[in-house]
Regions:
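Generic N-terminal amphipathic, Lys/Arg-enriched alpha-helix
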Residues: 1-21
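Residue-level recognition of alpha-helical structural elements
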Residues: 3, 22-26, 51
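Hydrophobic packing residues in well-ordered alpha-helices of helical domains and bundles
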Residues: 7, 26-29, 55
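Charged catalytic carboxylate motif
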Residues: 13, 25-28, 124
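A short, well-structured juxtamembrane/interface segment
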Residues: 21-39
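Glycine-rich, small/polar surface segments that engage phosphate groups of diverse ligands
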Residues: 35-107
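C-terminal binding/interaction regions
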Residues: 109-123
């Protein structure tokens, strides 16, 4: 089996995705995150597989950079990062509950949950 890859096609695909973005929606999402962060709310992010890595990366950058750039604290957590907790919920309850159970324990009204999915197919 031969893997066919073209840098040119890869770049074209990324340009197509970028051009399809709804800029107003993206700006609205950024503003929501900023408002929650600067009002002291918790922001939790989660995802499965590669999306879990993306979620972790967002929180890493936000926790570090918000403080370094503004001097303000950022209260962010990635629900995918605690492997022991994720697998405990998966084993004792169901994989469907690995994030919802953490949300019950960590988030309060008006906090923010961001779910990341590259495929859109995850049911949890």
């Amino acid at each position: 089996m031969t893997l066919k890859f073209s840098v040119s096609n890869y770049i074209k695909q990324h340009i197509s995705v970028i051009n399809s973005l709804d800029v107003a929606e993206l700006e609205s999402a950024i503003e929501l995150i900023r408002d929650k962060a600067f009002s002291g709310k918790t922001i939790a992010v989660c995802g499965n597989g590669g999306s879990a890595s993306a979620a972790s990366h967002y929180i890493t950058d936000w926790n570090k950079m918000v403080n370094l750039e503004t001097g303000r604290r950022f209260n962010g957590v990635c629900l995918s990062d605690n492997v022991g907790l994720v697998t405990a919920y998966a084993n004792d309850l169901s994989y469907d509950d690995v994030f919802s159970e953490q949300v019950k324990n960590l988030l309060f009204p008006n906090d923010l949950l961001i779910t990341v999915s590259g495929s859109g197919n995850s049911e949890n």
